[in-house]
Amino acid sequence: PQVGLIPFPRV
């Protein structure tokens, strides 16, 4: 999911 402005791969 996209967190803020930078898309972080949440695992």
From Swiss-Prot:
Residues where Valine amide is found: 11
UniProt keyword terms in alphabetical order: Amidation, Neuropeptide, Secreted
InterPro entries, per the entry: Periviscerokinin
Cellular component GO terms, alphabetical: extracellular region
GO BP terms: neuropeptide signaling pathway
Lineage top rank: taxon: Eukaryota
Keyword Chloroplast: no
Main location as per UniProt: secreted
UniProt keyword Secreted, yes or no: yes
Segments forming a coiled coil: none
Similarity comment: Belongs to the periviscerokinin family.
Name of the protein in its database record: Periviscerokinin-3
Protein's organism: Polyphaga aegyptiaca (Egyptian desert roach)
